Amino acid sequence: PAVAAQTEQNPQVGQVMPGVQGADAPVVAQNGPSRDVKLTFAQIAPPPGSMVLRGINPNGSIEFGMRSDEVVTKAMLNLEYTPSPSLLPVQSQLKVYLNDELMGVLPVTKEQLGKKTLAQMPINPLFITDFNRVRLEFVGHYQDVCENPASTTLWLDVGRSSGLDLTYQTLNVKNDLSHFPVPFFDPRDNRTNTLPMVFAGAPDVELQQASAIVASWFGSRSGWRGQNFPVLYNQLPDRNAIVFATNDKRPDFLRDHPAVKAPVIEMINHPQNPYVKLLVVFGRDDKDLLQAAKGIAQGNILFRGESVVVNEVKPLLPRKPYDAPNW
């Protein structure tokens, strides 16, 4: 249930009546890895992070995403707000919506007026999708009749330290390239994209060129999130990664992989962790790897299934002035 707590600075804070109960979490494998995330309004709300809800502008919202290879199993909204001292208790309320579904109501009590209040509202994880909006709606009253919605006495201030506590659990997804570049880059994930590049050993010039093409392509997708490409030599990564390998030069964990007869892009499980995926760029030699990298960057490969063969890459037309794709 939704509850309000007292703060040290404002010991007299009214009790908030219960909201809706949190629903049961989605059914997922209990042994899957999970992570706890705290998203504050300072991070995900429009600047400056705090909100002043008024009679004529009663709504405020925050937005957050969810990766396609994860599911939220628990969610809690932690609110810090101060209601106007002129409000009518109980008749004035703060309604909480997730994706336009009502999650609960926080009535304003007499003890809260003009004082900082802390409240918790459980969020039903079954309503959480790939893109989500939490909306706060202020229902304010300062007299029983003949109210002016533009009155300056109608306000409720929501602090920027308010936030969401989320528990994400990783799903064991199939090796399917039809959703590429997911899971190696997921546009729903607003964190910096860290994607290790794994080589059997120090790459030569042609392999450096191939890996640079792939890194540049992923970097263009990352955009404002930023990106990191740690380099590993003959090591297993601890997260989703890109692996470059040829028939003769490959990391030890791919030593039993069958030899290829053409450039191949394949999605496989991490040998020690099925929740981590590896994108293997395989070829007979470095020239094949360069061709596969160009195929990824130019986007003329039909990605589907666990692996695709890059038989040919059509050359790009010469660039014209002012035709940069990101302009």
Language model region names:
Residues 1-327:
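Solvent-exposed alpha-helical segments and adjacent loops
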